Amino acid sequence: FSLDDTVKSMQINTYELIDGEWHIVAGGGGQAFEDAEGRLALGFDNLADGLRIAIQSEHNNGSTSYFKESENDITGMGYATSVLSDKQEIVYDQEIPLVIQIITSKNEVHSYVVDYFFQPEEYEKYDYEYVYAITVLFSQKPVSELAN
């Protein structure tokens, strides 16, 4: 990703779609980030079980992960994952959807581009058991001023 020198922080959030609304399951805090360029890598099989995040930039290298005992029984379910594949304009303080993952026992899955994060009702139409999303947000505010 490429930013300007006014960036102060970044936030990576994982959501689960519940009753037509996105509910945060991990993230919400943020971290100081003041480099104009960097790389973000995400590692996961299914988002119900967790996520690994790695960030690399001129002054910032690190990784973090969260894994949880899933309350959701996904045994035998299939999943479809959509990822952001094109360059995206970064607008400060606006979430950018990176990944949408549908986990379901249904035989047919309608997968959408990640921009459908902003239209969760599309996923509700098909009554999938689980839908998850990962977003990133860059801000000119320090971490202490980010909304949680």
Where are these regions (language model features)?
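Structured domain cores in non-transmembrane regions
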Residues: 4-78
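Intrinsically disordered, low-complexity segments enriched in Gly and acidic/Ser/Thr residues
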Residues: 63-102
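Acidic, Ser/Thr/Pro
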Residues: 33-45, 86, 90, 123-126, ...
